[in-house]
Amino acid sequence: MGNTKSGALSKEILEELQLNTKFTQEELCTWYQSFLKECPSGRISKKQFESIYSKFFPDADPKAYAQHVFRSFDANNDGTLDFKEYMIALMMTSSGKANQKLEWAFCLYDVDGNGTINKKEVLEIITAIFKMINAEDQKHLPEDENTPEKRTNKIWVYFGKKDDDKLTEGEFIQGIVKNKEILRLIQYEPQKVKDKLKEKKH
């Protein structure tokens, strides 16, 4: 947890964020000043996070997905994120090291936090992702994955699971490493998130 209540970012947090987000020091300081304007306390609530996330997707409904992203990064369940957690949350959805990203993806899909993923949880996240895909883009999705239910079924088949089976973190990560098609199916198009972040920054 970083202390982000002061007017300037600490050297340690800056270095860590430069490493994890690939933003320059100048860019991070700009993000931080913007963050403090919206969240003077140095912490962001779930509602504020949803509001900021919504600005990236004016032609879609990212609220449900934003709630799940927030949950997955609110490690101590206090209902807030500090600046470091906030930036990593935004960037982990669009970039990040492979292992970190897969570990985060498991947390995202483990909706109830019990250490395993079931098919219902996959459907919940996929449904949230579909709300972020505009109607025109949905028309161009392959026939066997153009609804949340179809995409969830396809993912579950790729993992070799029956409807009532559960996935452990090891199975989840191993399955994706072996079959990159699963990674494509479980995530919102990362390039679109990256583009939205760059638009917001300028």
Swiss-Prot record:
GO terms for molecular function: calcium ion binding. InterPro entries: EF-hand-dom_pair (IPR011992), EF_Hand_1_Ca_BS (IPR018247), EF_hand_dom (IPR002048), Recoverin (IPR028846). The keyword Nucleotide-binding does not apply. It holds the Pfam family EF-hand_7. Keywords: Calcium, Lipoprotein, Metal-binding, Myristate, Repeat, Sensory transduction, Vision. Ca(2+) 1 binds at residues 74, 76, 78, 80, 85. GO terms for biological process: visual perception. Ca(2+) 2 binds at residues 110, 112, 114, 116, 121. The N-terminus is blocked. This is S-modulin. It comes from Aquarana catesbeiana (American bullfrog).
